[in-house]
Amino acid sequence: MRSLSCIVCRQKKIKCDRKNPCTNCEQAGEKCMFKEYDSRKIRHPHSYVKALETRLAGLEAFWKRVKYAPVNEKLELLKTISFNDHLSPDISVSKTDTTFEFPVSLDIRGPNTIAFYGPTNVYGPPLTPSSPETPSFPPQNPSFSPLITDCLKLFFKWQYPQFLFINREAFLVDYYYRYHEGRYCSEHLLYAMCAIGSRMSVDPNIAALAKNFYQIAWNKIIEYGLGKSHITSIQCLLCLGYFNIGMGNTSLGWMLSGMAFRMGQDLGFQLNPRNWSVNDHPVVSPADAAVRSRIYWGSYVTDIFISFVLGRPTTLKKSDTSIPDSESLPDFDGVNEYRVNNALLLKEYLCIQSSVY
């Protein structure tokens, strides 16, 4: 006796005695056929099911792009379809840790801002362009006063290891030479860094300016730093979040850091920008991709640190990440003044340790 009903009985939805041939087929004069194997016992691995879901999401996103694309672009989009076997069970089982890159839609709002939308977004391209009356990023006119420069040096010498979401080389090159056209140095970020750096000054008059710097940074980011997501706004929010946590305002610090992470996800900073292109031209240069990598992984460490200090769950998940590890940018003349003073940090650490024990 077989373990499965015959195909005819299953189609007619009648009880089969599972003989070969079965009684129902004999009486009806039909050919009795059985499946060779029981597919109910087949269990696909989770990675295989995940690959199917990812493939389906990609196809849905692709056809949405085709739907909203101009007529002259639809054919070009169809030519990009690949019919390779993406769902080999052997490959899926052997690569259980593979990160699946979801298809993205990019809203390029200007040279400094790119918004990311995943496969389930309801905004079909083209999106509404930004209003010209609303600046997508703050005006760039950082101050070169000795006070500002000294506070920045204090920030990088004493606090930088905790603020690795700021790429020192990219920031300083933009601060001094406007090399990146303000992408990595803005007023609100500058004053947020000064608020933290000034507190490390041995001069009580400079240390007392920390709250003033904080208020300036806060006013500026409220004025023009939240309307559109921007890299320096992410960094500023994290600096302000750290500042508040250090002052005991843990709820506000937690909220500001959460805003920063959400803004980063709006920019897709957890994804590998080297895969983004428009008309076969990369959207993000290799140098900018390296900076974005540092910003994301620095934010990732910050998320873990703040969550650990406050005993709360993290926001950024490694499983959602495809951006590669960060790399160091080349030095430039004058960067030594902004290096972390390891000897002084060790000396202070030993002093603190001796006072505690």
From Swiss-Prot:
Can you provide one Gene Ontology molecular function annotated for this UniProt record? RNA polymerase II cis-regulatory region sequence-specific DNA binding
Query: Which keywords describe this protein according to UniProt?
Result: DNA-binding, Metal-binding, Nucleus, Transcription, Transcription regulation, Zinc
Alphabetical list of SUPFAM superfamilies matching this protein: Zn2/Cys6 DNA-binding domain
Domain of life assignment: Eukaryota
One Gene Ontology BP term is:
DNA-templated transcription
Summarize which parts of the chain are annotated to bind DNA, as ranges. 6-32
TM segment ranges = none
> Mainly resides where?
nucleus
Q: Where is the protein situated, by its record's location annotation?
A: Nucleus
Does this UniProt record's set of keywords contain Membrane? no
A Gene Ontology cellular component where this protein is annotated is: nucleus
Q: Does the keyword Metal-binding apply?
A: yes
Q: Which PANTHER family match?
A: TY1 ENHANCER ACTIVATOR (PTHR31313:SF81)
Name the UniProt record assigns to this protein: Uncharacterized transcriptional regulatory protein C11D3.11c
What organism is this sequence from?
Schizosaccharomyces pombe (strain 972 / ATCC 24843)
Q: What is the lineage of its organism?
A: Eukaryota, Fungi, Dikarya, Ascomycota, Taphrinomycotina
